[in-house]
Structure formats: C-alpha cells, structure tokens
C-alpha cells in the first residue's frame, strides 16, 4: 500500500480482539486518494490522505 505524500501516513498494525479477548493480527488502512498536485511548480500525481485534502494542506490542480 502507498503512503501519503504530505503527512507520511501509511497503514498501521495491531490486534483485533474477540469477546474472549483472543488476539488476531489486523491492519488499519489510510484513506488515500490519488490526486494531481503542484510539486516544485509542476503537476504530479501522488497519493494524498483524505485528511490532508480536507484540511487544505494541498491544492488539487
């Protein structure tokens, strides 16, 4: 899975727990969108997290 170009977020790991508290490995995936943004004055298609887009850290081209 890709990671966010702006924030560096990537999938995280942990355990899911049943009612008996048995542990099973699982992952949490980041909500990534492939968007075109300006990088060094040129448009580039990169993976950006939805949170970075909503907070205005990047502008779409």
UniProtKB/Swiss-Prot annotation:
Domain of life, per lineage: Bacteria
Protein keywords: Ribonucleoprotein, Ribosomal protein
UniProt keyword Kinase present: no
One GO BP: translation
GO function terms (MF aspect): structural constituent of ribosome
InterPro entries: Bacterial_rp_bL28, Ribosomal_bL28, Ribosomal_bL28/bL31-like_sf, Ribosomal_bL28_bact-type, Ribosomal_bL28_sf
Cellular-component GO terms for this entry: ribonucleoprotein complex; ribosome
Annotated family: Belongs to the bacterial ribosomal protein bL28 family.
Protein name: Large ribosomal subunit protein bL28
Organism: Geobacillus sp. (strain WCH70)
């Amino acid at each position: 899975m890709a990671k966010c170009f702006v924030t560096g977020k990537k999938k995280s790991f942990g355990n899911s727990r049943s009612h008996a508290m048995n542990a099973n490995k699982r992952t949490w995936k980041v909500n990534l969108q492939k968007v075109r943004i300006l990088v060094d004055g040129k448009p580039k298609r990169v993976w950006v997290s939805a949170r970075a887009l909503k907070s205005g850290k990047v502008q779409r081209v």
